[in-house]
Amino acid sequence: MTLASIRRGYHVIKTLLQYGLDDVLPPKMTPWYFKLARNSLFWIRNKHKGKSGGERLKLAMQELGPVYIKLGQMLSTRRDLLSDEWANELAMLQDKVPPFDGALARQAIEAELKAPIESYFDDFDETPLASASISQVHTATLKSNGKAVVLKVLRPNVETKIQADLLLMSQTAKVIDYLLGEGNRLRPSEVIEDYRVTILGELNLKLEALNAIKLRNNFLDSDALYIPYVYEEFCYPRLMVMERIYGIPVSDIAALKAQGTNFKLLAERGVELFFTQVFRDNFFHADMHPGNIFISREHPENPYYIGLDCGIMGTLSEVDKRYLAENFLAFFNRDYHRIAQLYIESGWVSEKTDLQAFEQAIKVVCEPMFNKPLDEISFGHVLLELFRTARHFDIVVQPQLVLLEKTLLYIEGLGRQLYPQLDLWQTAKPFLEQWMAEQVGPKAMFKKVSTKLPYWSDKLPEFPELIYDNLKLGRKLLSSQQQMLDKYLKYQQQAHKSNYLLITSAILLICGTLLFNQDATLWSPYVCLISGAVLWIIGWRSRPKNRKF
């Protein structure tokens, strides 16, 4: 461990203690040696006693900087782990940090381009358009066609800083795991590993560019979503160049109202976009917070979304998609037995789970939701409550479903902010039912066969040879099995013969010994002893030597 990491560790501990976060730890996490260590840092006192635990955690993460802010944002979506009070506080964390020097940004961009900025761009503005914890954005125009673009560049040394903080988080999580023991609900190491994968993915702008290109291609003909054009020739691991857009932030409700935006259509399109990305394309934007979404300025009566920042994307397996769709349909049909079955069939919970107990737990959680009108029931909260319940039955955490749950909560919250009367179920139900109809029945079977047809057509000429080889292999196996059986029978015969001779020899030897003490003829004990010895030698030599069949 380096001196810098020790210094950073002390700063983290000091900050957490100054916000009194040691006071909110459960008893399991405060054994005598923890209390001894805490008392040894007597000069660090809680300076925020009047604030709630959730607010103190939010302020501490804000003070610790970008990596912890992003961790807090991620934790705010893990409502299966945290209480609503804590999750709501963490959701208020903002990824806003002071910009770094524009001259440093120029150097970083030129290092990636391996040429002066002026070789490819005009009007480069060293004052950033936006600044975040991992990167910042500068404007320019393309020299080749004069189009306005933005250049997104990583902060200097951000990878090193993030790796150092991740290592510290990982070590701390292992300690907490140890203190909480087996079966703890929080599972810190698991949470930090999910976070590590997510944040390291955001450090590669080339990957983000490829994600944006794929999402753009999926919605090229859509009137609901627009993804800015990415100039792939200028994209590198630390630099990304894309078309500049001029939209209205989705959170600016006043500006959207002023231009006469059709809020009902906009909210319904948001829901449709989510289900289209998940079920049609199996590639969904998993960071749909308001800072990444804009609304078009033109055609307010027929508005569309503009999506930015494709650093975090999610995918589901075909199995996950089917079980997810069936879960939603089963919930709205109040079929709790089927929901429990689906969780077990999908492998999300162990097959050893008590089905009846699991079904009853789901019913207890979900049934009260139907006291509300259908248009007030939240898909995201349904999924969240099911995950929370499944955690008591040892759910195997699925990172892709955590991303999906987070995205669904964002989309729902956004939809109801834009149009409070949004009936999510009525918007989504036809989509889910149509998708399920495409997955089962004659049409689905024909589609699957059609998809596999080119593969089987390619393999068809090999079938005769394959059948012949299998028959030949079968004959070899039968022959081999017959040989093994013959060897086994021979072994048994030899073993029986040997055992018979050895037992007979033992009887003769015992008889010979006894005859010495009786009034027997002179020769009879010797005959028994000699015969017994001879039979023992023959029996011993006739034992089967090889037990391999």
Curated annotation (Swiss-Prot):
Q: What is its EC number?
A: 2.7.-.-
Which UniProt keyword terms apply here?
ATP-binding, Cell inner membrane, Cell membrane, Kinase, Membrane, Nucleotide-binding, Transferase, Transmembrane, Transmembrane helix, Ubiquinone biosynthesis
Annotated binding of ATP, by residue: L129, A130, S131, A132, S133, I134, S135, Q136, V137, K152
Single GO cellular component term: plasma membrane
Q: How does it sit in the membrane?
A: Multi-pass membrane protein
CDD domains (UniProt xref):
UbiB
**One GO molecular-function entry:** ATP binding
At the top of the EC hierarchy, this enzyme's class is transferase
Q: Does the keyword Membrane apply?
A: yes
Q: Which PANTHER family match?
A: CHAPERONE-ACTIVITY OF BC1 COMPLEX CABC1 -RELATED (PTHR10566), PROTEIN ACTIVITY OF BC1 COMPLEX KINASE 7, CHLOROPLASTIC (PTHR10566:SF113)
The UniProt family comment states: Belongs to the ABC1 family. UbiB subfamily.
Give the protein name, as stated in the record.
Answer: Probable protein kinase UbiB
